[in-house]
Amino acid sequence: IANTGTDVTSLPEFRQADIIHLHWINQGMLSLKNLSKILESGKPIVWTMHDMWPSTGICHHARECTNYQHECHHCPFLYGGGNKKDLSARIFRKKKELYKAAPITFVTCSHWLEEKAKSSALLTGHTVTSIPNPINTNLFRPRNKQEARTHFRLPQEGKLLLFGSVKITDKRKGIDYLIESCKLLAEKHPELKSSLGVVVFGNQSQQLTNLLPFPVYALDYVSNEHELVNI
């Protein structure tokens, strides 16, 4: 709810800055009060959105809820479904008043998030644009597939389908689509059961072992960039 944070406006780095670039500011980094002081500084503000929080009352992902497009209230993520003056409504109104202080350029990391942000009543009148996250092509480039398979103890023959996310069982990452598509593929092409495998990386990847009609090779969570390159 952004009620605690650190006042950065007194820092030399802030005073010397020509532009202020915000990213993810939650969990005690910046409060709405701190953000207000930043906006009052008169410095140009760019805010890169890594989720929906800047454009909603309190949620980081609105899922099916569209209240943020008009005004947050009766939040489905609050116990009992919230009410007209619930936490989401109060924070929404605070943000709406706060954003009037200065123009903000909101940058999203995907076109999907750009569309969501542009539909928010909070960001009306502000610039919203999309700049996808860059990829280090010196690191992430094609490698020897056979060596990679050997490294992860994967079959040298056959096709491998790759699926990964921070948490495999998070429905927002498409796990249901993966299961459904694999079942459909096995139904229409049963011969693939002996030549296709599914490589999964991310937390709880082991849980997919018995949910797919193909062999599953679970690599668990991967944090090392060089390991990701090999995958």
Where are the language model's segments positioned?
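Short N-terminal targeting/anchoring amphipathic segment
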Residues: 9-30, 44-50
